[in-house]
Regions:
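Active-site-proximal region of nucleotide-activated glycan assembly enzymes
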Residues: 57, 116-178, 183
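Glycosyltransferases and closely related glycan-assembly transferases
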Residues: 87-100, 108-123, 136-141
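Conserved donor-binding/catalytic loop of nucleotide-activated donor transferases
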Residues: 118, 260-262, 278-287, 306
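C-terminal alpha-helical cap of glycosyltransferases
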Residues: 348-364
Length: 364
């Protein structure tokens, strides 16, 4: 490579797009320390904070959503979209971009087309088992497409896994368990069930846990309940509920601690979560979102079919189901161990490296 490569990464809107993008960026920087790395995002989404915090530059382009019905927005879509493409072409020119890497989200369609019109190669990573619209549109333009799941229907795609933080990809759960439980305020010697619906929480999970709080003292294990911001379970006086063998927090800053501490995890089935569960080998029960296009159930399919995880529909995640199923599963240490072993066997831990190498190969 005669000069330091200039890489522009596009993605954002949700952590499911931002975290893989940052993992790829970090690995490119590790392989090519002199690489010029720029990201594209929108001002009003979380990438505006998370990308600079991670040490990368970001340029903003307008958020132009594809119209799904006839409206004023639909009538003005094409001029707004054309403007976003034009602005992105200028950014790519100013950055002397050698390649554009897209991970999905609103910024990707104008980025893909700007790259195409500027004769800059495109690399794509698709996180979900059911591809998003942005990446489906960009796929025919891409020199390389990496996917996180083997059942992703994407032409010419290569299975690479989900780019993730090194702290998670290379987590040794057994070695980290005691410290992780201490960090999370848990008894290091008692089995741990962790229930989390992510940063925003999940009502079905929160309700199922809340209905069983008084039972936990008799079940022989402790429960860490990550409720989501503003979703604490409160008593009649408005104070967060406390009970034997039960601890609740609104969020955790380090999912690696959650994965290390848990003997069993009850969680949504986002692409990153499913991939991380497999990478670290933690037994899990997935409760897919009850809306959307069904991608969360598809994300979890390979682990569930391999008996590495369980899946329950959101509407069936009730307090009664929880009380009927969870105590016996938590008491079956051998089954949990086997679930974790099978999950780990399916995990892919070098996705960031695979995507970084594919990106730099396109530049050469």
């Amino acid at each position: 490579m005669s000069k330091a490569p200039s890489v522009v990464l596009a993605g954002g809107g949700t952590a499911g797009h931002i975290n893989p993008m940052l993992a790829i960026a970090r690995e490119i920087r590790r392989i090519e320390p002199e690489a010029n790395i720029l990201t594209l995002g929108t001002k009003d989404k979380m990438e505006a904070q998370l990308v600079p915090e991670a040490g990368f530059d970001i340029e903003f382009i307008p958020r132009v959503a594809f119209p799904r019905s006839l409206s004023l927005n639909a009538l003005t879509f094409f001029p707004r979209f054309a403007k976003a493409i034009s602005q992105t072409r200028k950014i790519l020119k100013d950055a002397n971009a050698d390649v554009v890497v897209g991970v999905g989200g609103y910024v990707c369609p104008p980025a893909y087309l700007a790259a195409f019109f500027s004769r800059i190669p495109v690399v794509i990573h698709e996180a979900n088992a059911k591809p998003g619209l942005a990446n489906k549109l960009g796929g025919p333009l891409a020199k390389f497409v990496g996917v996180a799941f083997s059942n992703t229907p994407f032409p010419r795609a290569k299975l690479v896994g989900m780019p993730m933080k090194d702290e998670i990809a290379h987590l040794n759960r057994r070695a980290a368990r005691a410290q992780a439980r201490h960090t999370l305020g848990l008894d290091p010697d008692k089995p741990v069930l962790i229930v989390t619906g992510g940063s925003l929480g999940a009502q079905s999970l929160n309700n199922a846990v809340a209905e069983n709080i008084t039972n936990f003292k008799d079940w022989g294990f402790q429960v860490l309940h990550i409720t989501g911001k503003g979703k604490a379970i409160v008593d009649d006086s408005g104070e967060p509920v406390t009970a034997p063998n039960y601890r609740q927090i609104e969020f955790s800053h380090g999912m690696q601690d959650v994965y290390a501490a848990a003997d069993l995890l009850i969680v949504r089935a986002g692409a990153a979560t499913v991939s991380e569960v497999a990478a670290v080998g933690v037994p899990a029960i997935f409760v897919p979102l009850p809306f959307g296009n069904g991608e969360q159930s598809l994300n979890a399919r390979s682990l569930v079919m391999a008996e590495a995880a369980l899946l329950i529909e959101d509407k069936k995640m009730t307090g009664a189901w929880f009380a009927r199923e969870i105590p016996s599963l938590m008491a079956d240490a051998q089954k949990l161990k086997e679930m974790g072993r099978r999950a780990y066997k399916l995990g892919i831990r070098d996705a960031a490296h695979a995507m970084a190498e594919a990106t730099l190969k396109v530049v050469k």
